[in-house]
Amino acid sequence: MTREEFEKWIAAHPADQEAFQNLYTVIRRSGPGLVAIPYSEAYRDALTPAADKLREAAAITANASLKKFLLARADAFLSNNYYDSDVAWVEMDSPVEVVIGPYEVYEDEMFNAKAAFEAFITVVDRPESEKLKVYLNHLSDMERNLPIPDAYKNFKRGSGSTIKVVQEIFTAGDARRGVQTAAFNLPNDERIRQSNGSKNVLLRNVMQAKFRQSGEPIARRVLDPSQDSLLSFDAYYNHTLFHELSHSLGPGIIKGPDGKMQENRIYLKAFYSTIEECKADVVGIWSLLYAIDKKLVTAFDAPKLFVTDAGLLFRSMRFGIGEAHGGGAALEWNWYREKGAIVPSGNGRFKVDYTKFREAVRMLAEELLTIEATGDYARAERLLKKYAVSTPEIEAVIPGLKDIPVDITPVFVGAGEKMP
């Protein structure tokens, strides 16, 4: 099926639009036409036993909120209605943090419209989680601080958000393949973000391994040695948190170019994931600068944040610029280079210009947020075609990193897996 065929079908059959754009349907041929089939039907043979297992788990847990989520998610697998179980997950307060179901849309390269199934089993690190709760009291201030007109700001979105720092003990499905997730902000349902907020989950042991095994070595290879001392795990850790918080900041449901009130992902189509990941990265920096200025963060300063962020962009680009995170990183790198926030220092290395980095971040945040606020597909396309690309400069750096792991590959020995 082509993009054009899909769009022509919706144009000719507007009653099908909602089902066709639903996160939880597959599109298949039916005679000469197309039909949307709910996941609960398309994957019944897998989801029925999965629902049974969730009910078995619910029967043996003593935590009421975890039990509620597991039972609700089991029902969702068979009904295809995930709203109640997503609300139950946001409200869940359990020492075991469980995520299971269809969530991210990165695998849908045509429209970023279909969610893939994944699972995380984690244990909550309560002391670390408590340390970060202070930021939640300032989400409205961070929204107010966004570099866009007030008409584009949304003070309801994310107001009920929570933060959990966890230790990952098992993953499966979409979470297991390819680039390993370091943190996530869910659910993606804008109705729930508006009414209940979202949950930000940081996988601390994963983040530590990523920084140690690939992030820091890459940054030391790319940056001028004079700035090596500014590399900071605390800056990386907090920027990852603020990246996730920033998924809940800015526009979500908008009045689009067609006058309809819909999620901006509908209008941005295949460009949405890269725009959103880049927005979260850049707005994360912008909001973290706010936290530094207000003394909410004292473990590092702005120069350490700038250097750590710049140094780790190549880590994301190595995932592939066609991937949402890699494309977003290329966009950032090329934008900062154009604005003079990152400059060559000789011998293929680069330095961060602290005097220009903040303004470059502000300008890029404004551009990305405006695209999301207006649902401007053409503007998104122009931005990505100009900046989310490989360049001779980038291609000259990548070969020099080939001895550094692209990412980590977890082995869950507690689940019976063996080291290779």
Residue ranges and their predicted role:
Residues 1-52, 68:
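A well-structured
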Residues 235-252, 280-281, 285:
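Active-site recognition of the HExxH zinc-binding catalytic motif
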Residues 36-232:
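Contiguous, non-catalytic segments that form substrate-binding/exosite surfaces or channel walls
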Residues 63, 273-290:
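An active-site-proximal "capping" alpha-helix that borders the catalytic cofactor pocket
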Residues 285-382:
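Long, well-structured alpha-helical subdomains associated
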Residues 251-278:
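Post-HEXXH active-site segment of zinc metalloproteases
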Residues 64-72, 88, 258-259, 293-308:
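Short, glycine/acidic-rich hinge or "gate" loops at secondary-structure transitions
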Residues 365, 369-420:
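Extended, compositionally biased alpha-helical segments that mediate assembly or anchoring
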